[in-house]
A protein has these predicted regions:
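N-terminal cationic leader/targeting segments used for protein routing and processing
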Residues: 15, 20-21, 676
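Sec-dependent N-terminal signal peptides
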Residues: 1-6
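C-terminal segment of classical bacterial N-terminal signal peptides
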Residues: 9-15
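Short stretches within intrinsically disordered, low-complexity N-terminal or propeptide regions
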Residues: 7-9, 160, 683, 687
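Local alpha-helix boundary/kink/capping signal
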Residues: 11, 61, 192, 630-635
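Carbohydrate-active catalytic/glycan-binding domains of CAZyme proteins
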Residues: 20-607
Length: 706
């Protein structure tokens, strides 16, 4: 370890990294890439909270001929409300979907009164336009969904998918100009025109806009403005029937739905919000947040995405059903009915084809917290035919399993209830299972059940620490924590954006590791490690592959690593397999905190990544830095969780000089000292993640007074 010395930092170095990205000062090659340690689902770092993600694939502006997957979302950085001041974009090369790069806060808006607008769910589209010389040029229209007064319909334009973007339709009062039509949760679809006989052939495209909260509207947009209704056309309102719960239509009695296919039941659509449209073959598929659950035997929730399909971008539509229920639908213990294994709040997303694989993107709320939502993804299989919808053609979205004979996953109970949407897993883009020989935080678990089959509402905790890719899970007696799935069979060659990895062969002699901190001092604790299912029966075929026994007299509040030999059960196994941890105890109530788990082989010892710490003194006296950052609000406009602040009062005779030590060779820091006897000292600390070129910087402000 290298002991680093203190140094002065110039004021220009205190510009936040996020601000530099937005202003174009940080090159793409210098941006943070999430490539440290085990990665799963959520597919972005566990400290990052990007809900409402709209997935797109665009050509990489820095590598012509290569393509990147982009996720364009809002940003939960306020901690006490939805979203924040920026539209956030992350992207990854389509050939490696585990290398997500933070492209930064691509757009913010500060009003004339100095306050920052909050940005809700956005959309971004690419259009080919002519430049001044008549040559084709790619331009990008951002629909940021500002919540600022009279700015909901704001539209912005840029030359790159990662910005910067400039508003197009604001007047001198910073309000959207007359005719701007885009509303809540905007979605825009670009229909490319290749037919020379089409009246829009010269323009090359038609544009359609969709919006609405508990009410659905669609319209053709004016290609000249991209923010107003096309002259000579009228919006379709309502576009889809909206519901107040599953099957209960909320639109006014007598509403005529002109955009539904003949014979469609308005109660089957259940629109809530979050419109998004894609083309699949010769059909158009609308994804939206919609009430679901009773159609497969569960309670009604809007924590699900539904879909419908049509022959044209504005319908007439046929209902397709549920695309994903973020509550994680599974069989109950005896398989007689379905149940949920995860938390509910809301969700938002869409489908996107990347290479030859379709995915559905959505978000989850840790323990149901809607202010720290996380980006999730699942593979899907889409089946469609060439027959027009008007003649009986269909689109069907299935859960996807690469190891199933028909590549279809579904959960079907013996009572006949069947959930056919995407499976909620720990995998992310690791669709062949998580590479087993890595540490996986509790944040990558996808099953959180208590002994009664519900969810422990105090389980998965939020994380705002950009140096620490970890979430901790509080555990009660009887809780079940599950990971679906580990790729124990390995992957022999790169496939579908996943790099090849080793499985648990007999040469490895594999062990399994669990990190757990006991917080209760009463009784012993047993952690059963189950494979394939949490229960031993003919429905789940769960198999106990190990047991961890924690004695009643074991230390409290002491994080321990427990290792068991599981080679007998996992070595030379094929495919992917779920691992469940079942926490048993003689007493009810809280047991402790589960940190994470993973496999290791006989030649290596699995280590849990630990973030760096700074040892700070003022006038020779050690102080404790704040653990939680200053969160964003309308006044500070923070777009990240890098700002920390504290007050410190000097003791008599104590000098205000700040000194910093850190026993980490990959850490650099600078200190702006107080000018005089009191004032604000600033510590800027830059952490280089081991084995990578990715850095994250924190700024600590210490307000020193006598």
């Amino acid at each position: 370890m290298l002991l680093l010395a203190c140094a002065l930092v110039l004021s220009t170095q205190n510009i936040s990294a996020a601000k530099k990205v937005q202003e174009g000062q940080v090159k793409a090659s210098q941006r943070f890439v999430h490539n440290y340690g085990g990665r799963g689902n959520p597919y972005l770092p566990l400290w990052e909270h990007v809900p409402d993600g709209e997935p797109k694939v665009f050509e990489d502006p820095d590598r012509p001929g290569h393509y990147r997957a982009y996720i364009i979302g809002s940003h939960d950085v306020s901690a006490n409300r939805y979203c924040g001041p920026d539209i956030r974009i992350w992207s990854a090369p389509i050939e490696n979907l585990n290398e997500w790069r933070d492209d930064g806060p691509v757009f913010t808006f500060q009003a004339a009164n100095g306050r920052w607008d909050v940005m809700y769910a956005p959309d971004l589209v690419e259009v080919i336009e002519k430049d001044a010389k008549g040559k084709d040029k790619k331009v990008y229209y951002l629909y940021p969904h500002s919540r600022g007064p009279r700015r909901e319909a704001m539209v912005c334009k840029g030359d790159r998918p990662d910005g910067p973007f400039t508003p197009l339709n604001l007047d001198e009062n910073q309000a959207a100009i007359a005719g701007s039509c885009i509303g809540f949760d905007p979605s825009v679809f670009i229909e490319k025109i290749t037919d020379k006989d089409d009246p829009d052939y010269a323009k090359g495209f038609r544009a359609y806009g969709y919006w609405g909260f508990q009410h659905s509207t669609g319209a053709q947009l004016d290609q000249e403005t991209m923010y107003s209704v096309r002259p000579g056309t009228t919006p379709v309102d309502p576009l889809l029937p909206a519901s107040s719960s599953y099957g209960r239509v909320r639109d006014r009695q007598g509403t005529v739905y002109t955009a539904l296919a003949e014979g469609q039941d308005p109660g089957q659509f259940n629109f809530f919000e979050a419109s998004s449209i894609r083309q699949v073959g010769n059909k158009y598929v609308m994804i939206f947040s919609g009430y679901s659950g009773p159609d497969y035997g569960l309670g009604s929730t809007n924590s699900a995405l539904r879909y419908c399909y049509a022959d044209s971008p504005l319908g007439p539509w046929k209902s397709g059903g549920v695309a994903v229920d973020s509550r994680g639908v599974i069989l109950n213990e005896d398989g007689t009915k379905l149940m949920t294994s995860n938390f509910a709040h809301n969700t938002h997303g869409s489908i996107q084809q990347i290479g030859d694989q379709w995915y559905i993107f959505y978000h989850r709320p840790p323990r149901g917290n809607g202010n720290a939502r996380q980006a999730m993804v699942a593979p899907i299989k889409i089946e469609w035919d060439e027959k027009p919808v008007s003649e009986g053609g269909t689109v069907k979205i299935h859960g996807y399993d690469p190891y199933a004979p028909d590549e279809i996953w579904e959960a079907k109970a013996s009572n006949g209830d069947c959930y056919s949407g995407a499976e909620v897993t720990s995998e992310g883009f690791n669709i062949y299972g998580l590479p087993p020989y890595a540490y996986y935080s509790a944040g990558y678990a996808c099953v959180f059940m208590n002994k009664n089959g519900g969810q422990n509402r105090n389980s998965l905790q939020d994380n705002w620490d950009i140096w620490n890719n970890e979430q901790i899970c509080n555990v009660d007696a009887g809780d079940i924590i599950g990971y679906k799935y580990f790729g124990l069979g390995g992957l022999k060659k790169d496939s579908k954006g996943v790099e090849a990895f080793d499985g648990t062969t007999s040469k490895q002699h594999s062990s399994f590791n669990v990190w757990f901190k006991r917080t209760s001092g009463e009784g012993g604790i047993t952690i059963k490690v189950m494979m394939d299912g949490p229960w031993k029966n003919d429905v789940w075929n769960g198999k106990e592959i190990g047991k961890i026994k924690i004695p009643a007299n074991s230390p409290v509040n002491d994080l321990q690593k427990y290792t068991i030999d599981v080679s007998e059960f996992v070595d030379d196994i094929e495919g992917k397999h779920a691992i469940y941890l079942v926490f048993d105890a003689a007493v009810d109530g809280a047991l402790g905190q589960f940190y994470g788990c993973g496999f290791n082989n006989k030649t290596t010892s699995l280590k849990r990544p630990v973030p760096p710490t700074l040892n700070v003194k003022i006038g020779g006296k050690e102080i404790e830095l704040p653990a939680e950052p200053v969160h964003s609000n309308d006044n500070n406009g923070y777009t990240d969780n890098t700002h920390y602040e504290m007050d410190y009062k000097l003791e008599p005779g104590q000098k205000p000089r700040v000194s910093v030590e850190c026993l980490w060779s990959t850490m650099q820091f600078w200190v702006d000292q107080v000018k005089g006897d009191e004032g604000t000292a600033v510590i800027t600390a830059e952490y280089l993640f081991p084995g990578t070129t990715s850095k994250q910087t924190k700024v600590y402000k210490i307000n020193i007074s006598k």
